Amino acid sequence: MNQLVECVPNFSEGRDKGKIKQITDSIEKVSGIQLLDIDTGSDTNRTVVTFVGSPKEVEEAAFQAVMKASEIIDMRKHEGAHPRMGATDVCPFVPVSDISMEECVGIANNVGKRIGKELDIPVYLYENAATTEGRKNLATVRTGEYEGLKEKLEDPDWKPDYGRTKFNVRSGATAVGAREFLIAYNINLNTTDRTYANEIAYEIRERGRWKRSGNTNPFYYKGDVVHFEEERYPDGNSNFIGSSFDELFEHYKKTTGKDLRERYLSLGLDPE
């Protein structure tokens, strides 16, 4: 079986179809690459692209996409509901077949090094590629977002893994990582009051409440709340990394007594 790697870069552009096409064209120009999915969001002003190929093909396609994004996206003008810190916000590599997580970590390092050296964009390695335990969680790495990046880069504790500590005002910074498949579980609430969504998120999100009185064994998921102006509802979202859909369905069944298969809309790609 041939080695197959998936890359799921997130770009800080979800409204200009011309710019999005320039990025996806740069990916498809790399021989052997299969572009599988393009998911754009106007409120988030963000596009998630999924493509697969051999390790070398994916390495090159990922770098070309980051380079194109750095040319056409100006973070000084970016506005959107989703947390972000760079033109290419995140660029994870996922082992699909006949390749190990360690090899994907190597790919993340190769791409991260090129981004830092050739594009002068600060790079932070996260998840399985993280160089310290404190950088494994993407939410932690992205704390402060683009607006707080200049100050963050001045902190010795946040020296980039690749690239200079100089603030790239146009492109921001990029998080490059290696991880298992991720299931993003989003819940739309039947209310325009964000308070309810915040309360739910505080209880289940990984960073959670500042203080959990009497709760010595809380459960955590990576989560946040995003308010979509177009649809006029708050959206609670949780990320399950390395999980299967069966585990997610079972969790929903236990907590609600209902079958999630009858109540959800699937977007993107099924890891199977």
Which positions does each model-derived feature cover?
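Long, contiguous binding/interaction regions
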Residues: M1-E272
